[in-house]
Design a protein with these regions (language model features):
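Cap/insert and terminal regions of metallo-dependent hydrolase folds
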Residues: 41-113
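Core dinuclear metal-dependent hydrolase active-site scaffold
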Residues: 1-53, 110-119
Length: 119
């Protein structure tokens, strides 16, 4: 497991940790609530691997999980942790970015608990 320090410069959403969990050739990336600008700093600062699973940023906000991140780490699947909310998360814009990147998308509001197993 690798834990990266905050790279944002303002707001609580930009000051969270990034976590890369690796088991053999299987990698999962958790970016928290950072926006696309901070994600760009992340991929410019660290040599991140291609990943299998991305915990989609900020519950599928249109401001997170940007194209730069998706093109850099090329996730196969994305998990969106989301429930009933007044923000409209996940947004159609974010969902379109994920599917355009070729990802399989899983959502806790539709599938409930999501279990990922590694051989």
């Amino acid at each position: 497991m690798s834990i990266y320090p905050p790279l944002g410069d303002k707001g609580a959403n930009e000051l969270g940790l990034t976590i890369l969990c690796s088991l053999g050739d299987f990698d999962t990336l958790i970016t928290g609530d950072m926006d696309a600008k901070t994600e760009t700093k992340l991929v410019e600062t660290y040599d991140l691997p291609d990943i299998e699973v991305l915990l989609v940023g900020h519950h599928g906000s249109k401001y997170s999980t940007g194209t730069t991140l998706l093109e850099s780490v090329t996730p196969e699947a994305g998990v969106i942790s989301v429930g009933d909310n007044s923000y409209g998360h996940p947004t159609e814009e974010a969902l379109l970015r994920l599917t355009d990147a070729g990802m399989t998308v899983y959502r806790t509001d539709m599938q409930g608990n999501i279990l990922i197993t590694v051989d």
